[in-house]
Swiss-Prot record:
Record's keyword annotation contains Membrane: no
GO molecular function, one term: structural molecule activity
GO cellular-component term (any): bacterial-type flagellum
Originating gene: flaB
Assigned keywords, A-Z: Bacterial flagellum, Secreted
Superkingdom of this protein's organism: Bacteria
Family of this protein: Belongs to the bacterial flagellin family.
Function recorded in the entry: Flagellin is the subunit protein which polymerizes to form the filaments of bacterial flagella.
Any Pfam family: Flagellin_C
Protein name: Flagellin B
Gene3D superfamilies the UniProt entry points to: f41 fragment of flagellin, N-terminal domain
Keyword Secreted: yes
SUPFAM superfamilies tied to this protein: Phase 1 flagellin (SSF64518)
Length: 394
């Protein structure tokens, strides 16, 4: 039936043309944006996942920047520690040279002073972005420095920032700005007090050098005696005793003229009365602190071996600290590589969810353009039908 009021063919062609136009707009949006899910209306689930993962990826980008900053801090501290180790090696060499008879210790001390100033300069300059890991205030105990390591979202959706920690303590900083507990300003107890006793047994005199208890460490007379030396007590029964073959024998200080020497090899015990033929010779090593080394002082000049031992212990601590910094640097490098790969993986995963396949979209767009042309032709034909009706009235 032909109607002049309703052109059903034209209406159908127009509806087809509208549908094709809508599909073309969608396809053109995909082509222009590169996304097949550009908004929640396209696919709510995929859009939600992609939005969350993009947010996490931005956080990982910030972590990457923080790792770069942390690596710079660690590298600065390591370079400073490495330079300080070389300087301390020079100080050790100067002390060894000072042991030679006839050398001018004052001249050597001048060189040591310059090296000590260089150590201070290194510690003060080893700072990056206001952070100095070679000197710190340790009055409140160890100080923990942290470097952002990663951004984590667990299975429950909770997020957290993981950190890489490094402790600034007496074995890792060169100087304690609030005291004397850093590697270079603390005192190394390299030698304990000793007493040399000349012992006369039946006319034969021998000398024995032994370590002794400190004056404030008294041995209880009822305690088991295992070879340590006892000091004189106080009171009516002044003195400490050791048991020899079932009998208690009084043990007295080295300042007294008589000594009780006890021998115990596990199976045999015996005691010998001795007589000190002269004042016992004592030896107390001078404290060894690199920051206070001054071999022009008699007490230190006479204990160069102790000073060298102290410097060697400081070198051991510095080497250990440098190794720790190297380990932290390696961990940061590994973490940085991992964060890069993780970020790439997230980008790839998000792309699979929301990116448009440009080959598919371009092919679809070409097909829709062809369909649009055909729909226009169809609409044109449908509209011309009314003109055919007019010819009937001519």
């Amino acid at each position: 039936m032909t109607s002049i009021l309703t052109n059903i063919a034209a209406m159908a062609a127009l509806q087809t043309l509208r549908t094709i136009g809508s599909n073309m707009e969608e396809t053109q949006a995909h082509v222009s944006s590169g996304l097949r899910v550009g908004q929640a209306a396209d696919n709510a689930a995929y859009w939600s996942i992609a939005t969350t993962m993009r947010s996490d990826n931005m956080a990982l980008s910030a972590v990457q920047d923080a790792l770069g900053l942390g690596a710079a801090k660690v590298d600065t501290a390591y370079s400073g520690m490495e330079s300080a180790i070389e300087v301390v090696k020079e100080i050790k060499a100067k002390l060894v040279a000072a042991t030679e008879d006839g050398v001018d210790k004052a001249k050597i001390q001048e060189e040591i002073d310059q090296l000590k100033d260089q150590l201070t300069s290194i510690a003060e300059a080893a700072s990056f972005s206001g952070e100095n890991w070679l000197q710190a205030d340790l009055s409140g105990g160890p100080v923990t420095k942290s470097v952002v390591g990663s951004f984590v979202r667990d299975a429950g959706g909770a997020v957290s920032v993981k950190k890489v920690d490094y402790s600034l303590n007496t074995n890792s900083v060169l100087f304690d700005t609030a005291g004397n507990t850093g590697i270079l300003d603390k005192v190394y107890n390299v030698s304990q007090a000793s007493v040399t006793l000349p012992v006369n047994v039946n006319g034969t005199t021998s000398e024995y050098t032994v370590g002794a208890y400190n004056v404030d460490d008294l041995i209880d007379a009822s305690a088991t005696f295992d070879g340590d030396y006892a000091n004189v007590g106080a009171g009516a029964l002044a003195g400490d005793y050791v048991k020899v073959q079932g009998s208690w024998v009084k043990a007295v200080d080295v300042a007294a003229t008589g000594q009780e020497v006890v021998y115990d090899d596990g199976t045999t015990k015996w005691g010998v009365d001795t007589t000190v033929t002269g004042a016992p010779a004592t030896n107390v090593a001078a404290p060894a602190s690199i920051a206070t080394i001054d071999i022009t002082i008699a007490a230190q000049a006479g204990n160069l071996d102790a000073l060298i031992a102290g410097v060697d212990e400081a070198l051991t601590d510095m080497t250990s600290a440098a190794a720790d910094l190297g380990s932290i640097a390696m961990r940061i490098d590994l973490q940085s590589d991992f964060v890069n790969k993780l970020s790439d993986s997230i980008d790839s995963g998000v792309g699979r969810l929301v990116d448009a396949d440009m080959n598919e979209e371009s092919t679809r767009l070409k097909a829709l353009q062809t369909q649009q042309q055909l729909a226009i032709q169809s609409l044109s034909i449908a509209n011309s039908a009314s003109e055919n009706v007019l010819t009937l009235f001519r």
